Amino acid sequence: AAMQGWLIGYLSTGARLTKEQWLAESAEYLALPDAWNDKSKLPILGFYQDELKQIQGQDLDYTLLMPSDDEDFDVRMQAFSEWAKGFLDGFGASGRIAEADITEDVMEILKHYDAFSYGIEADDIDEDSERLFTELVEHARVTALFMFYHFNQAQQEPILH
């Protein structure tokens, strides 16, 4: 979840990575002691392409990589928190967005992700937590799409008269 969050945060800024850059960035983010070996390069490169294709899709069916509903709530909440932190890390790592480019809506979303990155304390879990979790994941999904399209708008060709 954290790696997907990082990648989507990075891509949302309009930045793209070469294969070599992605291999280096992902290995560093995951704190791998060695770079990706030959067997693991293909899946991580495929992950990049799949995520980019999904977030760019016209059908807006991008989904967050979360553990299944069969997992304990704490495990799912931890993954969601890691996704949100990853998004913020990737968004910042791109270095493409100046403070002047951050609208009020974008700032609000970034603040939400910051709050999400802290998760829900075990003491705060009750019968409404499951519903709240589902709503938070959907909110993150929709706002990730918003962020991507906000900073990745196609450049309009000037109209010649």
Predicted regions and their residues:
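Domain-length accessory/inserted modules outside core catalytic folds
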Residues: 1-161
